[in-house]
């Protein structure tokens, strides 16, 4: 399944629910994406909008895109949300729902998407 199909699937009212820690309900999404080598600039340009808008969501702690320094066609989205409710709210946004259509012709293969919870972190 490609990123576009996965994004479209999530926006089609599929609930992604994960058992959360009572002590720390934070959730992270790690999405690894392979992009067609000649489409990396277009992909980054398309990603900027979802990054900017997602970072303004009340429940989003951060939403960033990283690029593999050894293979410029490989990218990783790293997202952190305050809880499951924030993840669900993100999946319901127009910018999330529209992202799949924007990148459908840019991706080279299936995405690897993981939703994880925080197991331990430094006390502040």
Language-model-detected regions and their locations in the chain:
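Sec-dependent N-terminal signal peptides
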Residues: 1-3
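C-terminal motif of bacterial Sec signal peptides marking the signal peptidase cleavage site
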Residues: 7-9
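Glycine-rich beta-strand-turn "strand-cap" elements at beta-sheet edges
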Residues: 11-28, 65-71, 101-124
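Mature N-terminal segment immediately following signal peptide/propeptide cleavage
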Residues: 27-44
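Short, glycine- and small/hydrophobic-rich beta-strand elements in well-ordered beta-sheets
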Residues: 52-76
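An amphipathic, aromatic/His-enriched active-site/gating alpha helix that lines ligand/cofactor pockets
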Residues: 53-61, 80-114
